Regions:
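Short, polar/flexible loop-turn hinges at active-site or ligand-entry regions and domain interfaces
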Residues: 99-104, 151-159, 175, 379-383
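Bacterial N-terminal signal peptides
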Residues: 21-35
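Short pre-active-site segment immediately N-terminal to the catalytic Zn-binding motif
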Residues: 78-86
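Non-catalytic beta-strand/loop surface segments
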Residues: 2, 38-79, 105-139, 175-229, ...
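A common structural junction motif
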Residues: 148-156, 250-258, 371-382
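N-terminal secretory signal peptides that target proteins for export/translocation
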Residues: 1-20
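Non-catalytic, conformational "gating/processing" segments within enzyme and secreted inhibitor domains
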Residues: 165, 218-250, 452-453
């Protein structure tokens, strides 16, 4: 199971929020490769779960090594749950949640956390929105009280909403509109999902953000911000009984104000055509090639998902990964190469591959070598050594993840918010151990195919402004492209 990553981060399951979450990805460091796989949990035998009378789910992850707690509230709503024409409202509401209630004026919550020596954050994904604080354990009742208050007590007026909308528009201009790589990533996301709401950016389309208003924010808030649509995760120096008592005294007093329904979204049809995009811009310092494939999430198909986890590690696992070893070390065509897979999603998700050519290498030559490497892997699969190294690396990440209570809280929160369970998280390492070389080869053969792919070229150019346009697939035997 994967923790939230950002996209998100190029997996832009894209976390976007007031602050960027600290744990976006695990970098492969020395290889210059970003393997977009977040840490997993190997064992968490002490995890406790219970549900309050108002329907709020609670997860407690005891960790007594330091007198500190991480307190998170996850709402089962993200950008993919937005009404058509109102993209960005989930992220916009995340901003507005810091604007105050009748009981606590704007900024007071953040000021109190800061005075207590704590940290806070919030982030929005396609499938969830989360808020968290990290404080000394004696301050847990304080942050629980504040968070419970703003669950239903937020005060929104035009004087609050409209200026914050301008803040979001400026955020979009800075992060996306002024960044060629982000523009291309956004276009690729839209090209990948032709029917599913994962197609629109988490921050929203500019023209639709401009039209968001107080009524939109209130309607979204009243529909989705209710205890029976929320998950409380507390990790740290606490006991389950203590958390239950505090949760009942704070969140337990919040009445549910909407009935939750199954999250049924338009699903992506089986893709039938390769899609290719190119963006040329004078601000591009390093050309790059990126390719994403439509694949199942863990919730959609556990067996395939775990095999895809192993595949991403075999292909993109640092300096020993197949792509880095082939394209960078052996052929000398790339300065970097990697792979990632975002398994934590409610619906079908993406598997990604990226590479950057050396200065004297054309991006077309690099792509041909990448195609050959993927085709060879789909034909022959991983070696026994590659498979063992990949599985060992994934399990090691799972063990290391237990050293960070914030990581544990994120992993459990993201899993539960996307339709999986705490048992799924705990069972994931044993599922990895059981993956065979044939399973890894099989998912590569079935999913790393042209019809399921969106390929992008980010190029250097003197042309301004940036322009993105579709590129026709290579007419010379596109069926050989993998």
């Amino acid at each position: 199971m994967l923790a939230p990553s950002s996209t998100d981060a190029e997996p832009d399951v894209a976390v976007t929020g007031r602050f960027m979450p600290a744990l976006m990805l695990i970098a492969a460091g020395a290889a210059g490769l970003a393997t977009m796989a977040a840490p997993r949990v190997a064992q968490a035998t002490e995890v406790s779960e219970f549900t309050l009378d108002n329907g709020m789910q609670v997860v407690v992850v005891p960790d007594h090594r330091a007198p500190v707690v991480t307190h998170m509230v996850w709402y089962r709503v993200g950008s993919a749950d937005e009404q058509a024409g109102k993209s960005g409202i989930a992220h916009f509401l995340e901003h507005l949640m810091f604007k105050g209630t009748d009981k606590h004026p704007a900024g007071e919550f953040s000021q109190v956390v800061s005075k207590l020596g704590g940290q806070e954050n919030a982030f929005t994904s396609t499938d969830y929105t989360a808020y968290f604080q990290r404080v000394a354990k004696e301050h847990l009742p304080t942050v629980m009280g504040f968070e419970a208050d703003r669950m239903t007590g937020l005060v929104l007026t035009d004087e609050v909403v409209l200026p914050e909308r301008d803040v979001v528009l400026e955020e979009r201009r800075m992060r996306t509109d002024n960044d060629p790589a982000s523009q291309l990533s956004e276009a690729a996301q839209a090209a990948m999902f032709t029917n599913h709401p994962y197609s629109h950016p988490i921050i929203g389309w500019e023209d639709e953000i401009k039209k968001l208003n107080r009524d939109d924010a209130l309607a979204f808030y009243r529909r989705f911000y209710t205890p029976n649509n929320a998950i409380l995760v507390v990790a740290g120096d606490v006991e389950p009984d203590e958390v239950r008592r505090l949760a009942e005294a704070t969140y337990g007093k919040v009445a549910k104000r909407a009935e939750t329904a199954e999250r049924i979204r338009p699903q992506e049809p089986t893709p039938r055509a390769e899609r290719r995009l190119v963006l040329a811009d004078g601000r591009v310092a390093q050309p790059s090639l990126s390719r994403t494939y439509l694949v199942p999430s863990y919730r959609g198909n556990k067996e395939d998902s775990v095999a895809l986890d192993v595949l991403s590690q075999v292909l993109g696992g640092g300096a020993t990964g197949r792509l880095y070893r082939t394209l960078v070390v052996e052929k000398g065509l790339a300065s970097s190469a990697g792979a990632w897979y975002q398994s934590t999603a409610l619906d079908d998700t993406r598997f990604g591959i990226s590479a950057s050519p050396r200065p004297d290498v054309s991006i077309d030559k690099l792509e041909a070598a990448l195609d050959a490497a993927i085709a060879d892997f789909a034909e022959n699969g991983p070696s026994a050594k590659e498979l063992e190294r990949a599985k060992t690396g994934l399990i090691a990440e799972a063990i290391y993840a237990q050293d960070n209570q914030g990581t544990l809280a994120r992993i459990y929160g993201a899993a539960l918010a996307t339709g999986t369970t705490a048992d799924d998280v705990k069972n994931w390492p044993s599922e990895v151990k059981a993956v065979t070389a044939e399973q890894v080869r099989d998912v590569a053969r079935r999913f790393l195919v042209p019809a399921r792919a969106v390929t992008t070229h980010l190029l250097q150019s003197k042309a301004e402004p940036a322009t993105a346009a579709p590129v026709q697939p290579d007419a010379a035997a596109p069926e050989k492209r993998t």
